[in-house]
C-alpha cells in the first residue's frame, strides 16, 4: 500500500496537525493507563525534531457531540505530555478559527468530539481542520476504521496528508502477517461470541493453515462437533455456520481444531472450582471456562511450528487464575516461538500484560476495532484516504 510517510517529509517551520489515539482511561483527573500516549510520543517527538509547529488532536470517551463536558476533557492527557515531553504543552479549546503557534511548540486541541459534525465526517468541519495546517498526519490506527472529520475528512482537504510512524508500523506489521505471511500461518481468535467475529473467522478460514478458536466461540464449535456443552455460553443458531467454517478450512488445506479436553466450573466467579474433563464428559450443569492441558499442548505444538501467528482474544476466562492456564500456555507458546507474531484487541493485551510477554511479541497492535476490520479484509477509510492523497 502506497502512502506518504511523515518520516520522509521536510517539516521545518511547518504547521503539522497530528491525529493520535489518546483515548485513555482517566480516573479523578489522572491517566490510569498510558499505553496509547506512550505509543504516540515518538511521532510527536519526531515532528519536534524536524522543526515543526505541532498540533495534536484526539477524541476521549463518548461525550455528547457538540457539547463541552469536563469529564471528557483531554486536560489529564496534556498534564501527562507536559512531563513526558519535558516542555509546556498547551490545551486549546477554541481552535477551529485558527491557532497562534511558536516554533517547536506543542498544542493539544480539546476533544474532537466536542465539535458538531465530527462523527458524520462533516465537510465544513473537515475544511476548518485542514485550514489549520500545512501537513496533516494520520497516526491513529485505533480509529482508522472510522470515516470521521478528524481521521478522514481533514485529510481530503489538507495540503499534504500522510501516515505517521505509528500508523505506518501498524500497516507494515499487518501486511507482513496477512498479505505475504511466512507459513504455516496460525490465527487464534477468542472471545465470547461467534456472531461478533463471524466475518473475521470467515475471512481467516480462507487464508490460514490453522485457525484456533477460544472462549465462547470455541464452545459453539464444540457443540457443532456433537459434544455436550452444558450451561456454557454458546450460540446454537450458529452451529451450522461453525460446521461450514470447518469445512471451508479443510477445503483450503487448513484446519479448525476442536478441543479434546476442557476445564469446567459450575458458576462464573473467581471462587468457582475448576474441574478438568474430557470434552465428551461435560454434564448439563457444567460451564466450559478454559481448554484443558492436552488441548493446550497440541495448540502449543502448532504454534511452535508456525511461521506467522495472529492472536486476537484469550482462549479461556483468564481473569480467574484457575481458568487461565490455557491462555497462559498459548501466550508462552507464542513467546517461545520463532514465528512473526502480531497481537491485538483489549483482552489480548490484558493477557499479554498478565503473563509478562510483551517483549516477546513481534508486534502489538494499538487498534481494537481497526485490527478486527483489517483481519476481515476490509479497507480502512483513513488508509484509503491516505492512499488516494499519495497518487
From Swiss-Prot:
Q: Pfam families, from UniProt? A: PGK (PF00162)
Enumerate the Gene3D superfamilies for this protein: Phosphoglycerate kinase, N-terminal domain (3.40.50.1260)
- Residues annotated for ATP binding in this entry: 197, 319, 345-348
Q: Which reaction does it catalyse?
A: (2R)-3-phosphoglycerate + ATP = (2R)-3-phospho-glyceroyl phosphate + ADP
Q: Which domain of life is it from?
A: Bacteria
Where is it localised? Answer: Cytoplasm
Q: Which residues form a coiled coil?
A: none
Q: What class of enzyme is it?
A: transferase
GO BP annotation list? gluconeogenesis; glycolytic process
* Major place of residence: cytoplasm
Which pathway is it part of? Answer: Carbohydrate degradation; glycolysis; pyruvate from D-glyceraldehyde 3-phosphate: step 2/5
Molecular function (GO) terms for this protein are: ADP binding; ATP binding; phosphoglycerate kinase activity
Q: What is its EC number?
A: 2.7.2.3
- Positions bound to substrate: 21-23, 36, 59-62, 113, 146
A GO CC term assigned to this protein in UniProt:
cytosol
Q: Which UniProt keywords apply?
A: ATP-binding, Cytoplasm, Glycolysis, Kinase, Nucleotide-binding, Transferase
Cross-referenced PROSITE patterns:
PGLYCERATE_KINASE
Q: How does it assemble?
A: Monomer.
Q: Which family does the entry's similarity section mention?
A: Belongs to the phosphoglycerate kinase family.
What is the name of the protein in this document? Phosphoglycerate kinase
- Classification lineage: Bacteria, Pseudomonadati, Pseudomonadota, Gammaproteobacteria, Alteromonadales
The gene for this chain is pgk
